[in-house]
A protein has these predicted regions:
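Conserved catalytic core of sirtuin-type NAD+-dependent deacylases
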Residues: 1-226
Length: 226
């Protein structure tokens, strides 16, 4: 099992929301946490999409060695599933098959009125507020905003995978975003079951792990595969 966060995608050029140089430490008219909330989206969709298109829809982003290393482990039958807090879809772009996106995906959209699913390529992002071609209501990304709960099916299936894992690798996450970070407690960390952590710096979970590796996750996972 692999459980990953924003640090998995930083080597692709995406910002880590909570690092020192990350998105949440930059200055905007509103705090990013407020902009990326349900209430803000409903009240100020124009400002929401301005931020969303500028900071989350970054063109030319491609999978990095970490994504491809995980795909290789999955292909070899050594990795049963990937649970990610990321919304960028890079695991699937790298060819990974069993991916649970706890916070949704920027590649899926639906309208707020009737939940019509709108293919990404059919959305006109040149407008200030994209509208549904069927009912003309607002379109929103299928991502979990602040004030919203996680998808129950994805949550329960993720927990089941963690409970059945004999090795859990955690990478690129500060484990500060709940309820996603709380899933780690479902891992049966006893007997021969091992917990491995890969991060660039020290964190609160280090002392509980059987192995902690500090460094770039792409380089470390590539070495594991080779």
């Amino acid at each position: 099992m692999f459980f990953g966060g924003a640090g998995v995608s930083t080597e692709s050029g995406l910002p880590d929301f909570r690092s020192v140089d990350g998105l949440y430490h930059q200055k905007y008219a509103f705090p990013p946490e407020e902009i990326l909330s349900h209430d803000f989206f409903m009240a100020r969709p124009k400002e929401f999409y301005q931020f969303y298109k500028e900071k989350l829809l970054i063109p030319g982003i491609l999978p990095n060695p970490a994504h491809y290393a995980l795909q290789k482990l999955e292909e070899q039958g050594k990795l049963k599933a990937i649970i990610t807090q990321n919304i960028d879809g890079l695991h699937q772009m790298a060819g990974c098959k069993t991916v649970y996106e706890l916070h949704g995906s920027i590649h899926r959209y639906y309208c707020v009125k009737h939940h019509h699913r709108i293919p990404e390529e059919e959305i006109d992002f040149s407008t200030s507020i994209p509208l549904c071609p069927h009912c003309r209501s607002m379109i929103r990304p299928d991502v979990v905003l602040y004030q919203e709960g996680l998808d129950e099916r994805i949550l329960s299936e993720s927990i089941a995978h963690i409970q059945n894992a004999d090795l859990l690798i955690i990478g690129g996450t500060s484990l500060t975003v709940y309820p996603a970070a709380g899933l780690i407690r479902y891992f049966p960390h006893h007997g021969n079951n091992k917990l491995v952590l890969i991060n660039k710096e020290e964190g609160r979970l280090d002392t509980e792990c059987d192995l902690v590796l500090y460094g770039k996750i792409g380089e470390i996972l590539s070495e594991v595969v080779s």
